[in-house]
């Protein structure tokens, strides 16, 4: 499974105690989860993809630019991320490496990952990235969501009934987790790692990162494309250029996550990938 989303709940340096949920969403699976949590907690949603793009627009050459936030003693820290090839996506890992949290105590921290299948050691990898910036999770969960990765011949979206079952079960488990995080419950590690978590994340995941993830196989059927620009608008890493009246073009800049947001959001199914 490759796709899903990212969020982090923290506060900007301000005199007000406003906790935010920073989310990263591609096809919408974890946007749904982030909104569910925000509805239950009253927290504010911030789009991490927009934050990353804004940083690039200001100075794309500054790869050492940090994202700094301040936490008060009574505020929580939370993360939710997509699983790409049994790993956290590259954009999320880049953000975490550049994240700086100013805190005076060990604030309560939880993490959520979403995937269409098992997650392998994705959470372990993510927690190691957090540890490198002095953050430790107290509880974590993985949610099984509708499949969105279609990049290989044997992988496809779920049938309608399977999708319905996944959504129902994910909603039930998320509601239970929300009740736990509201009271800062620690020690929850409800992760569907799968049968071969290390092989999937370390070996196959490395192969995905090196040889499969990328924008080269994407193309547009010019006759079907209505030139609406939706694909460029939904790309979380800004890898698609679009000018009114023209067909979209991929930038081949190494940022593509193979999240298939463009593929799934195209209203006329004009975007193709490989033989699909």
Give the ranges of each region predicted by the language model.
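Glycine-centered signal
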Residues: 11-13, 60
């Amino acid at each position: 499974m490759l796709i899903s989303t990212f969020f982090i709940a923290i506060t900007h340096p301000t005199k007000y105690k406003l906790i935010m949920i920073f989310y990263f969403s591609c096809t919408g699976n974890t946007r749904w989860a982030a909104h569910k949590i925000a509805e239950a907690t009253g927290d504010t949603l911030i789009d991490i993809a927009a934050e990353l793009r804004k940083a690039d627009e200001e100075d794309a050459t500054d790869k050492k630019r940090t994202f700094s936030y301040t936490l008060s003693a009574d505020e929580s820290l939370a993360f939710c991320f997509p699983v790409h090839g049994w790993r956290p996506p590259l954009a999320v890992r880049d953000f975490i490496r550049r994240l700086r949290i100013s805190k005076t105590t060990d604030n309560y921290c939880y993490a959520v990952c979403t995937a269409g299948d098992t997650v392998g050691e994705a959470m372990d990898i993510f927690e190691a990235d957090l540890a490198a910036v002095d953050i430790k999770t107290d509880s974590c969960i993985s949610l099984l969501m509708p499949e969105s990765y279609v990049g290989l011949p044997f992988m496809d979206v779920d049938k309608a009934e399977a999708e319905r079952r996944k959504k129902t079960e994910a909603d039930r488990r998320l509601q239970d987790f929300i009740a736990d995080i509201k009271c800062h419950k620690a020690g929850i590690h409800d992760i569907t790692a799968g049968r071969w978590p290390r092989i999937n994340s370390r070996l196959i995941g490395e192969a995905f990162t090196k040889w499969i993830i990328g924008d080269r196989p994407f193309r547009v059927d010019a006759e079907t494309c209505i030139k609406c620009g939706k694909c460029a608008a939904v790309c979380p890493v800004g890898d698609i250029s679009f000018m009114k009246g023209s067909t979209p073009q991929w930038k081949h800049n190494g940022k593509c996550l193979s999240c298939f947001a463009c593929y799934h959001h195209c209203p006329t199914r004009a975007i193709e990938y490989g033989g699909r």
